[in-house]
Amino acid sequence: PYPMRHHRTALPLAGYTIQQIDFDPATFQPEDLFWLPYHASLTGWGRKRQAEHLAGRIAAAYALREVGDKQLPAIGDQRQPLWPTPWFGSISHCGQRALAVVADRPVGVDIERRFTPQLAAELESSIISPAEKTALLRSGLPFPLALTLAFSAKESGFKATPAANQRALGFADFQIVEITASTLALMFAEQRYLLHWIASEEQVITLCALQQ
């Protein structure tokens, strides 16, 4: 049995299944963490962070089950999930929602709350270059939505990038070159990343699975 009260939804996107967990942190009890083999390392965390972490790992467990693996990801020295061989995976959180996806290749998933016009104006220069803004405006999407997608896509692209290359990376290393009604193209170190996205009125989700 899975701990903490939650509701699972399977979201198909680009041939993958994202496991979405909507959870109620008010139902979280510290003993719920005993479900995780490494629970002792989480005891110093605040309750909210513990609940979010647990929700992400519940999503990860469902995602691994989807591919026939009953293990849970271990935890790395940066608190990152360590996926069982031969799988790659990714986890993301936003409010009372957590997502996870597992794939046979490097993969990144990200969920973000949609920017308001005011927030988009404040954050624009820290997320995109003038050249990228041209690509966003060409998409025909409302600018706050396009900027949220750009931010989320760079997060997903970063997560899909091999860990050895991640350390010195920032947003400027990923360039948005195109956004369509369902995809987004990024350039990173002369590689083209093709991402897929979906949006609701409140949130966006981006998925980056690298070509093998």
Task: Please annotate each region the language model reported.
Residues 1-212:
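Core catalytic alpha/beta fold that binds nucleotide/phospho-ligands
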